[in-house]
Amino acid sequence: MSQELDYLSQEVALGRGSRRDFLGRAAALGISATAANALLASAAHAAGPRKGGTLKIGLQGGAATDSLDPALAANQLTFHVGRMWGEELVRLTLTGQLRPYLATEWRSSPDAKAWVFKIRKGVQFHNGKEMTPDDVVATMQRHSGPNAKSGALGIMRSVDSVTRDGDSVIFTLKDASADFPFLLTDYHLLIQPNGGNDDPKAAIGTGPYKIVTNEPGVRTIGARFANYWDSKARGHAEQVEITVLNDSTARTAALQSGRVHIINRVDPKVVELIKKAPGVTVQSASGRGHYVFNMFANTAPFNNNDVRMALKLAMDRKDMVDKLLRGFGTIGNDFPINASYPLFTALPQRPYDPDKAAFHYKKSGHTDTILLRTSEVAFPGAVDAAQLYQATCAKAGIKIEVKREPGDGYWSNVWNKQPFSTSFWGGRAVQDQMWATAYITGADWNDTRFFNPAFDKMVVAARGELNQAKRKQIYQDMALIVHNEGGVIVPMFNDTIDAIGPKVGGWIKNPNAELMGGMATAECWLEA
């Protein structure tokens, strides 16, 4: 039986999907009605969400500088906390399709320059106010205004205006965009009362949990919201408590002792050890996530493409993947797209070539030591990765100084601030969203300072191209530009590796992001 049918049967059992749609999809896959109904019955027996208890989660990624303003969410902690209290108009399913959330349906104009979203009625904010299309308009305007500071600013720059039309909201775009609804899955775009303009850090949203305690860098607690609009499908625990456990050993110990029920970012080197703990299950999924070494392409010495090329050629990707990921990932190729994305085209793999790296480095004229900043919060094994890289660079005559930065404050003081550092990306729903978020001029999260007017024009052209073959070619050309000229080194695409204790129910493997694509806080429950 396909993974898709397993997933869809659980969705029906949990009240999040339609039995009719499931049977239709099963028939399309050649599954008999008898077999399909048996699968549904099995899922219904196993599903049965239980209400109550406190679901405890230990996460790497939190810091004292974390904000509850969704516009500023920049790490795993703020992503998962946002999923507790807030919701977007649409979200991704396990199979990469769009699922209605605060919007019930959508349609586009024939030229794909205007998109109309019908807003769900009867949804209440945590402050008792009913959500209206005006709140949606204000939210989108806050993330796209001239003074906006938002991780979604790159994708929102394509929006010319957002207006209300009765029960709907109309997005008028500057250029055609065939994938525009997918962009609205961005986790920064949580709908807030009056768009969050009154108090963006109040964490007042429409999600299943209302924030009752928030100690940045320590813990966040959400209590089940009594008037949540979809309580059958989500919000099963009475409370969800997220504790920041940035140290990998401490996080693992907390799960093994039962102090927490779920942890993220399991280091591949301890997977076999964790599996031996009674009742503990390791959950891994391959997807779009990738680990990166970011160079500011507008800052010396990285503003010289020979330096950038030398540093790319000095990366032994296979060795790094073998030693760090241990089978939980694949080799990267210096652009952020892999086969998980539609319209992907592979490029010839860049080899580890210290001689060629030395050639480009000598050609650049640079001879000084290059400072690389890293931290274990950048990604599991980031410090080890930096040291491996230091050694392979040395073989090309490139001197790298590795500076290990504190985890607390890394995302506010180092990432997107310092010219050479390690980081990670969880990937995005579609190629346009990934490119627009981090690679176009003007994007707040352009963490390689890659500014290329020709590339920017290609992003716009691909966005509006309805001929899939032509669009695929544009994406290939874009990938080649970043591969050869960009400031990003992508050594690997990582699997997400989480671990859950014996009391956790409702877990469904999801490739979109760690912890069930960010849905574990809302959709998991505690078994008796």
Regions found by a protein language model. Give the residues of each.
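Gly/Pro-rich hinge or "lid" segments in bacterial periplasmic/extracellular proteins
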Residues: 93-97, 184-235, 239-241, 247-249, ...
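Aromatic- and charge-enriched surface segment that lines or borders ligand/interaction sites
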Residues: 104-149, 170, 254, 301
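N-terminal secretory signal peptides
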Residues: 1-21
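Surface-exposed binding/hinge segments that line
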Residues: 118, 151-194
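Detector for C-terminal structural segments
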Residues: 25-41, 75, 215, 219, ...
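Ligand-site clamp/hinge motif
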Residues: 197, 227-273, 390, 399
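Alpha-helical secondary-structure segments
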Residues: 56, 132-139, 166-172, 207-208, ...
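N-terminal lobe/hinge region of extracytoplasmic solute-binding protein
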Residues: 58-110, 141, 204-205
